[in-house]
Amino acid sequence: MSDFFHSDVLSVSELNAFAKSLLENHLAGLWIAGEVSNLTRAASGHYYFSLKDSRAQVRCAMFKGAAVRLAKPLKEGDHIEVSGKISIYEARGEFQITVNEVRLKGLGQLYEAYERLKAQLQAEGAFAAERKKPLPVRPQCIGIVTSLAAAALRDVVTTLKRRAPEIPVIVYPTPVQGAGSELQIAQAIKTASQRAECDVLIVCRGGGSIEDLWAFNEEPVVRAIESCTVPVVSGVGHETDFTLADFVADMRAPTPTGAAELVSPNRQESLHRLAQAQCRLKTVLEQRYFDASQKLDWLARQIRHPRQKLDEQRASIGKLAQTLSYSMTQNVRTHTARFERQTQALKHCRPDVSVCKKNIDRFQTALSHAFHQLLTHRRQSLTAQAALLEAVSPQHILERGFSVVKNTRGQVIRNADVLKQGQKLHIIFADGETDVRVSKEQGQQDLFDCI
């Protein structure tokens, strides 16, 4: 001690400094448990409180840098465990703890593991709303994962029978607390997912201490819910109890009974909604029928309207035709009367017109007679010339037994002197044609061979 102090008599400051050194050097790294009292939170974000038990208390200060790491704010009466620098505030000689870390009393490593797993799941997006599966509106089968001895099972089954007795229920039994229960709960969830017998799955248990509910904070249960192909509704504990299973489930209910109400349609509500739907459907159908009738009437009027127009146009055309006929008749009568008047006037002016007309008629008759005689003579002459031409026509000559012989260039062969043995010829008869070849010399019989 003499090495630390200058004399055996200590000053107050020396005493406090010595005590501070001892505390900081020998009590580092300890966890101290107690109840929060006299809690004050400064505007700066610092916490000042006393940590007490039944026989003593110690002043604590937790500065903002450490306070921001709290999972939730401190409150009066919290039972916690703190770790930090145990020391003395020298100016007043007050014993205090400068707190660096806080955890709930009794949870220790479990709570720390809880926070780590929660942070990991949060980072993985396991709590994200977009990964939540929607619950079926009217499930055909409901599954329940819980203990057969649990009061929660009776509550859920009673609620389902009351609200939707027609929906079958399948129970996947498992212990819900105790050593190894988390593995059995996870296996029951996996079994329900693999069998795919139900449309929605309730994972539930009744209320209890945090230790009783802890299995639903374990990673096997959380991962089983996350990977389940069936929508999962959690109903663990009471409304104020939250577990990691609640965060990762597709829907969280405050209680097991609440979970049953979430997954089951209420019979009375369903009947009421059905009646409302029928009423709305009837209204819609009546309105559509009325609209269709109105449209049909309008279309019928539109169909009659063109017929009326056609009738009107037909009547108008008839009137116009009558007017035109009357006008033409009047014009003809007028011009006829005018022509007759002019004819009579012309007769009076030229008395010899009638004589000239008679001469013209006589001349016309004589001209017509002479034309017919000339036409008859011309026809007779044409017939005689046609007969003469027919008599001397090549075809007529051929019909009398003659033929025409041509070489390959189409030239007519008039005598046999020009023919050569083997020469090709073309012969035309009255009833056909053929090709031949000269086979013998001139003067021999059978001069030609047919090809």
UniProtKB/Swiss-Prot annotation:
Tree of life domain: Bacteria
MF terms (GO), sorted A to Z: exodeoxyribonuclease VII activity; nucleic acid binding
Primary enzyme class: hydrolase
Quaternary structure, from the entry: Heterooligomer composed of large and small subunits.
Protein function: Bidirectionally degrades single-stranded DNA into large acid-insoluble oligonucleotides, which are then degraded further into small acid-soluble oligonucleotides.
Similarity comment text for this entry: Belongs to the XseA family.
Name the UniProt record assigns to this protein: Exodeoxyribonuclease 7 large subunit
